[in-house]
Amino acid sequence: MISIIIAYATPEKQVEIPLTVEESCTLVVAVKRSGILQQFPEINLSQAIVGIHNKRTALDAGLRDGDRIEIYRPLTMDPKQARLLRAKRGKIRRMVRGEAG
């Protein structure tokens, strides 16, 4: 038996589910056994991007003791747009505080 963690996060909540599975268990089987799909019905496992320790991984991948399986949410905003928005917010904060920028 091996010990793993299933992780998923929304903007409001982060969940980590510890799980013990057989050494022959695949990623998809572990996710289904964890119950996370019932907690977060918005997860579509057939379309979700998953990874182990921040590295994208296939659903049929084998697991090792200590693996952290992560289920990634789709991006809600283009990364370039998000950076521009954060930069504008920072500039406004500096102006309000009277800092040069």
Curated annotation (Swiss-Prot):
<protein>
    <recommendedName>
        <fullName>UPF0125 protein CBU_1303</fullName>
    </recommendedName>
</protein>
<dbReference type="InterPro" id="IPR037021">
    <property type="entry name" value="RnfH_sf"/>
</dbReference>
<dbReference type="Pfam" id="PF03658">
    <property type="entry name" value="Ub-RnfH"/>
</dbReference>
<comment type="similarity">
    <text>Belongs to the UPF0125 (RnfH) family.</text>
</comment>
<dbReference type="InterPro" id="IPR005346">
    <property type="entry name" value="RnfH"/>
</dbReference>
<dbReference type="InterPro" id="IPR016155">
    <property type="entry name" value="Mopterin_synth/thiamin_S_b"/>
</dbReference>
